[in-house]
């Protein structure tokens, strides 16, 4: 997947919102979910389309992603975004995630479960 600087920044900003306090593997996993959605054909066909799809990632709809993107995401989130864009997937193909405490079956990484 070819990605512009803006795509990397936007993905990194989402990662920071959703997993900024998680370990690096947890940050990468959030990026992998976006890329898995992009490749699936069941979601919008651009990184921004996936991130801003209505009802999917609350921080995007609430303006937090745009704010972090404008101010520059932290370096670990940028690195995770770049690695996810490079097709690195530590979730087993997951297209969704939620809090691990939800009890949902899936791959648990940090405080999230990916499915």
Please give the residue ranges for each predicted region.
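Bacterial extracytoplasmic/cell-wall-associated proteins, especially those involved in peptidoglycan
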Residues: 2-115
């Amino acid at each position: 997947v070819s990605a512009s600087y803006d795509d990397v920044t936007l993905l990194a900003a989402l990662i920071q919102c959703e997993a900024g306090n998680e370990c690096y593997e947890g940050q990468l996993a959030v990026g992998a979910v976006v890329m898995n959605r992009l490749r699936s054909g069941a979601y919008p066909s651009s990184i921004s389309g996936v991130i801003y799809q209505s009802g999917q990632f609350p921080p995007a709809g609430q303006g937090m992603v745009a704010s972090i993107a404008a101010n520059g995401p932290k370096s670990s989130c940028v690195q995770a975004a770049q690695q996810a864009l490079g097709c690195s997937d530590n979730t087993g193909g997951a297209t969704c995630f939620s809090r691990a405490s939800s009890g949902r079956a899936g791959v648990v990484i940090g405080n999230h479960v990916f499915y």
